[in-house]
Amino acid sequence: MNERMVDQSMHSEETDFELSLRPTRLRQYIGQNSIKSNLEVFIKAAKLRHEPLDHVLLFGPPGLGKTTLSNIIANEMEVNIRTVSGPSLERPGDLAAILSGLQPGDVLFIDEIHRLSSVVEEVLYPAMEDFFLDIIIGKGDEARSIRIDLPPFTLVGATTRAGSLTGPLRDRFGVHLRLEYYNESDLKEIIIRTAEVLGTGIDEESAIELAKRSRGTPRVANRLLKRVRDFQQVNEDEQIYIETTKHALGLLQVDQHGLDYIDHKMMNCIIKQYNGGPVGLDTIAVTIGEERITIEDVYEPFLIQKGFLERTPRGRKATPLAYEHFAKSNEERE
């Protein structure tokens, strides 16, 4: 799958860029106000008790700031953070090596925690509840259990698929925080802040236009801003103006709803070739040349959220709103 401008997952070259933009304190974090308010209380209470923060589960769509929040939690608690991904913890020994190296109060951040193997997850249970590990050494008759005491720590788990977590793991998190898509006002503020970090001026109309097309996701907003900045610099404009912004987004094929060429390809397939549906997912996949799982996990959720697509027992179906929007878009292109 080619990387898309509106893909909510991080592109391979974006790690350093994202790191440079991330706020380090709650007061700098824009949006997610309910989560910020709750975390302020939980962190202050934990510090007053001189205890580590309770284990935190962060869940929601990609690109909304779960990794950023994990680092902010560590900064606010004034402790170190160790970051790993669920798939990288293949054996209980991998987890034991990391946990035994933590200092009291430290934060362990496990991204994609829903992808932990069952054997690693079972070792994690006593570590979360009672701060010890039971490790089996040897095999057969010579196998024996060794108990390793751990310093109190905070586990922050992040997932885009909270429903894929097992009940026992989910229940061991004392704090559950769901990140929601950002509103346009917060995205506008994020875009203006990012422009300042990049040393680029931007007019308010451009910030609003970018916010509208960012799919409620800061990662997408920052990516679009970077590309529009390219056009501004080539044009030798003193700042990003609305004319340049609209021109750039048009060439990037990101429309006013944040839909790109793949979204248009998929919806036009349903509307034009299959009379609006219902049509089976496998049929759509073959017609547009994409994998079924990619359509289901990457393309569909936003189209459904925006009211353009319905899932029915008989297949996918275009909504009246889809007919209105895509017919108009096709006329403009013609």
Swiss-Prot record:
Residues 1-182 are annotated as: Large ATPase domain (RuvB-L). One of its GO terms (cellular component) is cytoplasm. One of its GO terms (molecular function) is four-way junction helicase activity. Residues 183-253 are annotated as: Small ATPAse domain (RuvB-S). ATP binds at L21, R22, G63, K66, T67, T68, E129, D130, F131, R172, Y182, R219. Pfam families: AAA_lid_4, RuvB_C, RuvB_N. It catalyses: ATP + H2O = ADP + phosphate + H(+). DNA binds at R292, R311, R316. GO terms for biological process: DNA recombination; DNA repair. CDD domains: AAA. The keyword Protein biosynthesis does not apply. The RuvA-RuvB-RuvC complex processes Holliday junction (HJ) DNA during genetic recombination and DNA repair, while the RuvA-RuvB complex plays an important role in the rescue of blocked DNA replication forks via replication fork reversal (RFR). RuvA specifically binds to HJ cruciform DNA, conferring on it an open structure. The RuvB hexamer acts as an ATP-dependent pump, pulling dsDNA into and through the RuvAB complex. RuvB forms 2 homohexamers on either side of HJ DNA bound by 1 or 2 RuvA tetramers; 4 subunits per hexamer contact DNA at a time. HAMAP family: DNA_HJ_migration_RuvB (MF_00016). NCBIfam families: PRK00080.1, ruvB. Homohexamer. Forms an RuvA(8)-RuvB(12)-Holliday junction (HJ) complex. HJ DNA is sandwiched between 2 RuvA tetramers; dsDNA enters through RuvA and exits via RuvB. An RuvB hexamer assembles on each DNA strand where it exits the tetramer. Each RuvB hexamer is contacted by two RuvA subunits (via domain III) on 2 adjacent RuvB subunits; this complex drives branch migration. In the full resolvosome a probable DNA-RuvA(4)-RuvB(12)-RuvC(2) complex forms which resolves the HJ. Has 3 domains, the large (RuvB-L) and small ATPase (RuvB-S) domains and the C-terminal head (RuvB-H) domain. The head domain binds DNA, while the ATPase domains jointly bind ATP, ADP or are empty depending on the state of the subunit in the translocation cycle. During a single DNA translocation step the structure of each domain remains the same, but their relative positions change. This is Holliday junction branch migration complex subunit RuvB. It comes from Staphylococcus aureus (strain NCTC 8325 / PS 47).
